[in-house]
Regions:
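A basic, amphipathic helix-loop patch mediating RNA/tRNA/ribosome contacts
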Residues: 9-54
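A positively charged, amphipathic N-terminal helix/segment that binds anionic biomolecules
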Residues: 3, 57-69
């Protein structure tokens, strides 16, 4: 499980995928999110700009990313 420490109140979903090394670019993040390959807290998420806060969990391609403060 990858852990992302928040520097601000939130991080956007596309940025979180890049920070965790799950994707190589913002374009790649946009594509996998739009295709419904990413879940936030167990629900498929289609918005790249979705704000993630402390306690949120992202799953993509068998990887889990936990958002912490």
């Amino acid at each position: 499980m990858e852990v992302i420490k928040l520097k601000d109140e939130f991080i956007k979903l596309g940025q979180a995928l890049k920070a965790a090394g799950c994707v190589n670019s913002g374009l790649e993040a946009k594509i996998v999110i739009k295709e419904g390959q990413v879940c936030v807290n167990g629900e498929v998420e289609y918005q790249r700009g979705k704000k993630l806060h402390e306690g949120d969990t992202v799953t993509f391609d068998g990887e889990t990313i936990k958002i912490e403060k």
